[in-house]
Amino acid sequence: ISITNHRLAVAHEAIDSGLYETLQFPFSYLAGEQEMALVRGCREKNMGFIAMKGLSGGLITNSAAAYAFEAQYDGVLPIWGVQREKELDEFLSYIDNPPRMNEELKAVIDHDRAELCGEFCRGCGYCMPCPAGIEINNCARMSLLLRRSPSAAQLSPEGQAKMKKIEGCLHCNQCKAKCPYG
């Protein structure tokens, strides 16, 4: 039996309960000490750890760095959110030639951590639905998505129309109340 969630308190309860064989939780090289503690807790309780959002919803663009980071943790099995065939080919190539952590990949990780760590939307969608029809999980990450992923979809008339809905925000804070990251 496994459990999946995005809330630290629930994850700790699951580990402490002894009822589960695995925990599925967001974990990438943007993870903080709280997520690292979950990995350690699972290892101590002989639980597997399934790392979802290993590419942080598309914000991490260097798959070799992501793979090398995850490979450092015994008992962690990542789920790669592959969106393009090119990405699938990259991960398939790692079966025979897995990336190992080195200074070059550490530099990539350090750069991304400096740019992305802290308060950012992970794109989980727990904030949805919005009573004003705002696609919060994409709108909240738009500045990062424009810099770090192909931008054609975001800059299309449809993408711009979705962003325009922000002007109709009701400021009801339902999204904040539902966000598992605070």
Region roles according to the model:
Residues 1-37, 43-50, 55-58:
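Glycine/proline-rich, positively charged
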Residues 37-182:
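Structured C-terminal cap/extension of enzyme domains
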